[in-house]
Amino acid sequence: YSKATGTLLVNENSNINTLLDLKGKHLGIAGGVYDKTWLLFRAYSKSKYDIDLKDIVNPLFASAPILYKKMQDDSLQAAINFWHFNAKLESKNIKALIEISEILKELDIQKDVSFVGWTFDTKFANENKDLINAFLKASKESKEILKNSDEEWNRIKEQMSVKNDKEFEALKNGYKKGIIEEF
């Protein structure tokens, strides 16, 4: 469905410029200890610095909305959150420290990877192949429309409940970055 996933965000005034600057600090993580983004960040730090990120930070596992609010009120200096919360935060005074694309490059992963997808019960899938194929086709077509049509984005803008144009643009661009071109 999408290659959009977590980015490690930091407050611009935090003086955090690399993963190593997180030593001894709290790092908010949406999900749990087995969250795929957290595991990828750990693999990245091991590959780049020969250090497991879990050994230098104080991980705080919490829900995405809580981390979003903690980053907004500056009570948390760094967090790995879901893409749409990150997009909203990046429209504020918060910057990306490391994006998933940088991690994949470091780990020598060259192709698009789907981080978000659908699962179907095997029996249901076998009994409803046409329905599932139609669903997947509609999903692909809708992504193509949203990838290429500002008019369509403007049509759905009100339904997105964005607070301002900057947040709208951040969500739109984040969604487009998540579209898988080749799988």
State where each predicted segment sits.
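Flexible glycine/proline-enriched surface loops and loop-helix/loop-strand junctions
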Residues: 23-26, 117, 175-180
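An extracytoplasmic/periplasmic, membrane-proximal ligand-sensing/linker region
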Residues: 90-91, 151-183
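Short, glycine-/small- and polar/acidic-enriched structural segments
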Residues: 1-53, 58-60, 77-83, 97
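Pocket-lining segment of extracytoplasmic ligand-binding domains
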Residues: 65-156
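Sec/Tat-exported extracytoplasmic proteins
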Residues: 23-26, 31, 45-49, 89-93, ...
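A short alpha-helix capping/helix-coil boundary motif
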Residues: 18-21, 45-49, 63-67, 100, ...
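A generic short alpha-helical patch detector that favors 3-5-residue windows
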Residues: 33, 108-112, 163
